[in-house]
Amino acid sequence: GMVTSRLVDGPDGHGWTWNKDPQLGDTLHRNKGEYLHSMFSVAHDHGFRTGLYASKTKFSLFDLSWGPRYGEPDPVGEDNGRDKIDVYHMKTRSENMVDDLEKVLKKEQAFDLLMVHIRNPDTAGHGFEWNINIPSIYMAAVKKADELLEDIFDHLEEPAWKGRTFVIVTADHGGPLGLKEHGDNQNPENFTVPFYVWGPGIPAGADLYALNPESRLDPGTTNPLPSPGTLPPIRNAGAGNLCLDLLGLPPIPGSTVNAAQDLKVR
């Protein structure tokens, strides 16, 4: 959802519910029955350099779907090719993956659009339960993820990146205390996730709902379905279109979350 800015279900949803590595020949397009655009395809078609650094093998789905074989021909201006993700890099240890990323970030203009996936909290929650007591395996994993984010932010303070880089931090789900699964989509411990945005011109400590009183509504402890005439909550699926908006690019074709690119962050 984050990369397509679509919800899962419904005629406009991306439809992918398989939570394992893709099988031979699997793509988001084949599963949906039609081509699905993404933030990677829009950015790449406009000549932007894209990357995906991940710590789970299942993210190969994105590289397959928008790679040189299944990516759609570039319809915008100069032909930038069918491979919409210039660099796909996967290491199962987040620490090793971020180490590799840090080496790349030392190069000016390494990427225009980059997605980084850190697996530690999710792996600990599923393996040992969501436990916010200290000490716990889960909180140790959260601490490690925080340290890895700090490493990335340190590099973004370098002159090549400072003052012209935006960062969005979010998650795909939460987790109920004392459990290892998150299947109940009406439990706020499952659907409440962080959505932080940093970058030039973004006011420190501002609340995104306060910045968007006419277009977004805090759902509190409810998980509302999309409904005409009702303001939606801020959804993590809006991240893809927000990234493109911050880059000065149009929304993802066929997207339904933040499709108007009206989520204000500054």
Predicted features by range, described:
Residues 63-82, 102-151:
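Active-site His/acidic residue clusters
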Residues 3, 185-247:
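Substrate-binding rim/cap in mid-to-C-terminal beta-strand-loop elements of soluble/periplasmic
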Residues 8-9, 50, 56-61, 119-124, ...:
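Solvent-exposed loop/turn segments at secondary-structure junctions
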Residues 1-45:
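Active-site nucleophile/metal-coordination loop of metallo-enzymes that catalyze phosphate/sulfate
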Residues 1-4, 40-42, 49-54, 61-63, ...:
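Structural recognition of the beta-strand scaffold that forms the well-ordered cores
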Residues 26-109:
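A substrate-binding/cap region within the structured catalytic cores of diverse enzymes
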Residues 144-185:
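Metal-dependent active-site segment of extracytoplasmic phospho-/sulfohydrolases and closely related
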Residues 249-266:
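Polar, surface-exposed loop/tail segments
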